[in-house]
Amino acid sequence: MWLSDEFPRDLKTLRDRKPLVHHFMNFVVMNDAANVTLAIGASPIMAHAKEEVEELASKANALYINIGTLDEYWVESMIIAGKAASRNNVPILLDPVGAGATRYRTEVVKRILSETEVSVVKGNGGEMLALAGVTGGVKGVDSIVNATMDTAVKIAEEYGVTAVITGPWDYVSDGVRKVIVKNGTPLLQYVTGSGCMVGSVIASFMAINRDFVKASVEGLVAFEIAAEKAEAKSKAPGTFKQYLIDELFNLTGDDYVKMAKVEVVQ
């Protein structure tokens, strides 16, 4: 199994180091994102004030920019933080929430991509298709279409990033390497912000692993294995979310070896 040796080591490193992950997180999911970051072993900070984001982003081990809550103040803070992270070699994960739903959101995403050095872009099928120039795939912030590996490769090549497309299957590519993650459960679609939360876990692995394809796969598999284990304990979304956080906290390297469904595409 790909990463079966590396994942246990990286999970231990993550929990030993407790890296700082600076979040720009939307109001809807902020508490849950902080909790999953803590559960996997990293240290979250949710800070958005222009007066401090440059300092915090410079000191962080990873920066996660989630555009779910947008106004001009937040956008300027995101740009300030992104530039500071770029200057200090801090990896940036961008979640283009709702890209394609409005012109404003799409323009903000492209501005962040042009003015900062984003390492990973993670979104659902509709959002990522919008970045690839295909419209009509987003309703609100939800995807109404599926994207494919070809979309991930196109985005990776166009923007110089690792692209992560989440869905029933997850597609990860840096334009050269291509990986499909097949873990997960349909229950995740009934938990608001599950995609935002998986971004927190990916960013946590990015903080200790600068191979961003591997870090993205590690984060996806960790979150989705925890979701599968949570589903075994609850079939309803409220308690499922509670168990999801517990299972992230209890996750082991052996869980990856036993449960990961990862396909490297040749």
From Swiss-Prot:
Pfam families: HK (PF02110). Its EC number is 2.7.1.50. Substrate binds at M46, G193. GO terms for molecular function: ATP binding; hydroxyethylthiazole kinase activity; magnesium ion binding. Keywords: ATP-binding, Kinase, Magnesium, Metal-binding, Nucleotide-binding, Thiamine biosynthesis, Transferase. It comes from the Archaea. GO terms for biological process: thiamine biosynthetic process; thiamine diphosphate biosynthetic process. Its cofactor is Mg(2+). InterPro entries: Hyethyz_kinase, Ribokinase-like. The keyword Transcription regulation does not apply. SUPFAM superfamilies: Ribokinase-like. The keyword Nucleotide-binding applies. It catalyses: 5-(2-hydroxyethyl)-4-methylthiazole + ATP = 4-methyl-5-(2-phosphooxyethyl)-thiazole + ADP + H(+). It is an enzyme of class 2 (transferase). ATP binds at K122, T166. Pathway: Cofactor biosynthesis; thiamine diphosphate biosynthesis; 4-methyl-5-(2-phosphoethyl)-thiazole from 5-(2-hydroxyethyl)-4-methylthiazole: step 1/1. Belongs to the Thz kinase family. Catalyzes the phosphorylation of the hydroxyl group of 4-methyl-5-beta-hydroxyethylthiazole (THZ). NCBIfam families: PRK09355.1 (NF006830), thiM (TIGR00694). This is Hydroxyethylthiazole kinase. It comes from Caldivirga maquilingensis (strain ATCC 700844 / DSM 13496 / JCM 10307 / IC-167). The gene is thiM.
